[in-house]
Amino acid sequence: MAYWNYNPEIAARKKKNADIFRETTKLIQAGGYITPSGKQIRFDFTRMLQQGKCFQQEIPIVSSPSVEGGTKVMVESNDCLVAAERLVKEGYNPVLLNFASAGHPGGGVETGARAQEETICRRSTLTRSIYSFDAKYASRYGYALQAGEHYPIVSEFSAVYSPAVTVFREGIDCLFMEEPYDVAVVTCAALNLNGKYPIKLTPDGHMPQAAIDITRNKIRTVFRIGLTYGHDSLVLGAFGCGAFKNPPAEIAKLFHEVMEEPEFKNKYRLITFSIIEDHNSNNRNLRAFEAEFGVAPKRAKLPAPDNITSLQPNQIFVFGSVCKV
């Protein structure tokens, strides 16, 4: 007989995460929120909905001028949303890579999962975009289904571009930000090599050639989308190196190889790999990227990944009325 190993601490954490996301959804549907100081923030979805796009076919090669001084590469132990905020404040126009679930926009955010995609969805308006590219989710949340291609995003050229995503929750406790910021997001699914799908790791734990070829095209797709829409910087990370079991050293090498291709070499002002080690990574990801790019990682002082305490009595506004959530 099989037993389910119930952990009340994990269950409580997942419930809290799910509660936070439900609140985030209410705020998105309400159109904004009230900051702790009482300032009213309104979301503007115009650009997101007008310029957002789901890609399923190979994007044509992009011809872009090289940047003066070449591309600066960083590896940092940091929250990807904090890294994106820093770049925005420094005057960059970044695009952030969201490590997607191929079949379910937002992954397990509704049930409190805590991987990178779910974290982004809890803390921003991203689901307002990606849910509108899936008929089931668009219907569930009352959003109009976007024209064109839709989920699932399973091919080597599949991705969703979401401009002007508003990040409005802090990393610690997901509290409301006094000064939210907008950032573009590319949602792309890494290849799942955890053994449950046809393409698997080799017996000695390496990526087979089929996985290498597919992943290289996924990376090219992300880079091309960024250049197509005029972005000058990328916030990347250990793509697929958690639960999907992609070897971090090989993923880092693939990123490096694509960056050196003539189409992409020195076309971005800055590329940063923002990496947080978690229960899936066994502390290998940051070291692998540091070794590949030969740079010492910038280490931010981060809270424990599970440091999510009780929600504050935040407020939302609905058509001008202030309400408690």
Question: Over which residues does each language-model region extend?
Answer:
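Macrodomain-like recognition of ADP-ribose-binding/processing modules
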Residues: 1-234, 238-325
